[in-house]
């Protein structure tokens, strides 16, 4: 009777699958493509191993052949699974964007301010809106790298600083007051 212990030890490895939840979309695609390529070979190895394991009259040559099929496909399966990569943590970017969006949503503070300081504030606000939209794109991109997320967070924080500084730099337009009270200027 053929010794099937090695075959029985190796057979469960063919059932390994990659967990795609929380993985970068591009890595999931690579994994799926690789799994599709090896599908037939993998299924054939499983079928052959199961057949030989359950065949009481299997010969040593059949056991050896089944093991060879497993040994041929197992590294390909392991490689496919290794292609999966976790998504990067973007929670700090999400929080920075929330703070920026809060500042953008504030009531317009420019009425009654000098033209130059109001224009500066509006320009910084438009830039902040552009950066916020760009940040949302990075947040939505499951394939974003840690570096891309970090760089975008820095841009968001800079936009918030610029917007806050522009708000603090707003100056009341005194000429409006002077036009309304001409008698006091004499």
Briefly describe each language-model feature range:
Residues 1-186:
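Beta-rich interaction/scaffold domains
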